């Protein structure tokens, strides 16, 4: 049997990359390589007619992806096949041994395929008070806790209002799940196999796993008072997060190329580093790190300015701007912080934890040590 020429060409290209880069994690390298190839193809497709239907790429969250988030990954932990619909954790009962697993599935969505999708989603007209209340409701939810400000705003603007009368079924046990709900007012109860297992009111949410998989509902949810709910469907949620993940990786890749100390990193190393970074916004006058404290993170300045001060030295000893870095000394030498860094303007930094610092910055650790100000 003759192999397809396109397949042979792809393998030859991959072999060339592997020979050149000599990666230690071959599986991750191949996954990142094909992700990048697919992303470039999607960008090229945006300039002309698509030759394939929307969503025909690899399965979300990514080819060869692990349980950790790329966007930080989308999801940090593994879950049961059925959703625990709300605080009642209706699926928390131990499953009978050797029972057949309930299958779940999710749409195949290629990163970048929905570029600008968030702007195309119908926007609601939430008041400032409603936005604040809804933000508090979702900020502690495991699916939303790692969203950056822009992605969270897109999610909130995509919520659709749903009003329910007392006694109305909102979801039914066993039905396919496709919506997540936040309770703005009223009360609901959770019923599993005909038995009430819990209830909740304003500020609570339920149906999270519907945003990940079209899994069967684990419980029935009934309004016990007239309710105002805000709902989000799975496809919209995944569009927002996947588009955000793709844009975030592209943004960090461009940013990391401009950081002088990281100039020796190849695209493979930059992609791994970009996936591990998290953004943090610091208000003016707030200390990012404080002299004498233990260090657990490395920082890169994305935007804004910060001032460096040291005990025993008068005034500002240095001003940090976009592309500058700090916090490496404590991680290189297991020392307390050697200076205090305070935001001069609104500051946005990319942070990398100690484990990631040592694991992902191997190629540039020698440069960091050479520039170690404590020597």
Curated annotation (Swiss-Prot):
One of its GO terms (biological process) is negative regulation of Ras protein signal transduction. Gene3D superfamilies: Jelly Rolls. 3',5'-cyclic AMP 2 binds at residues 261-375. Residues 83-97 have a biased composition (Low complexity). 3',5'-cyclic AMP 1 binds at residues 143-258. Residues 64-82 have a biased composition (Polar residues). GO terms for molecular function: cAMP binding; cAMP-dependent protein kinase inhibitor activity; identical protein binding; protein kinase A catalytic subunit binding. Belongs to the cAMP-dependent kinase regulatory chain family. Tetramer, composed of 2 regulatory (R) and 2 catalytic (C) subunits. In the presence of cAMP it dissociates into 2 active monomeric C subunits and an R dimer. This is cAMP-dependent protein kinase regulatory subunit. It comes from Yarrowia lipolytica (strain CLIB 122 / E 150) (Yeast). The gene is PKAR.
């Amino acid at each position: 049997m003759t192999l397809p020429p396109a397949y042979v060409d792809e393998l030859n290209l991959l072999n060339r990359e592997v020979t050149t880069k000599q990666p230690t994690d071959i599986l991750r390298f191949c996954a990142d390589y094909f992700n990048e190839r697919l992303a470039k193809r999607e960008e090229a497709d945006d300039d002309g007619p698509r030759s394939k239907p929307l969503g025909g790429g690899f399965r979300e969250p990514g080819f060869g992806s692990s349980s950790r988030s790329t966007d930080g990954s989308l999801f940090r932990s593994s879950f049961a096949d059925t959703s625990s619909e709300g605080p009642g954790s209706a699926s928390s009962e131990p499953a009978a041994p050797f029972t057949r697993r309930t299958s779940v599935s999710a749409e195949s969505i290629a990163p970048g395929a929905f570029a600008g999708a968030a702007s195309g989603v119908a926007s609601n007209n939430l008041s400032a008070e409603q936005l604040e209340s809804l933000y508090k409701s979702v900020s502690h939810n495991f699916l939303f806790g790692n969203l950056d400000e822009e992605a969270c705003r897109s999610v909130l603007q995509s919520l659709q209002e749903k009003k329910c009368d007392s006694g109305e079924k909102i979801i039914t046990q066993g039905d396919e799940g496709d919506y997540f709900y936040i309770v703005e007012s009223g009360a609901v109860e959770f019923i599993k196999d005909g038995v009430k297992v819990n209830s909740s009111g304003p500020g609570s949410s339920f149906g999270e796993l519907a945003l990940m998989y079209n899994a069967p509902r684990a419980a029935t949810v009934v309004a016990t008072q007239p309710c105002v709910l805000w709902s989000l469907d799975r496809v919209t949620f995944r569009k927002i997060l996947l588009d955000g993940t793709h844009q975030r990786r592209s943004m960090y890749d461009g940013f990391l190329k401009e950081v002088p100390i990281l100039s020796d990193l190849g695209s493979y190393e930059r992609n791994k580093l970009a996936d591990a970074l998290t953004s943090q916004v610091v208000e003016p006058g707030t200390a990012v790190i404080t002299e004498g404290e233990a260090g657990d993170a490395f920082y890169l300045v994305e935007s804004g300015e910060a001032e460096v001060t040291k005990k025993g030295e008068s005034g500002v000893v240095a001003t940090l701007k976009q592309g500058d870095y700090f916090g490496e000394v404590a991680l290189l030498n297991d020392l307390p912080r050697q200076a205090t860094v305070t935001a001069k303007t609104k500051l946005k930094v990319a942070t990398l934890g100690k484990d990631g610092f040592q694991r992902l910055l191997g190629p540039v650790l020698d440069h960091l040590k050479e520039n170690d100000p404590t020597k």
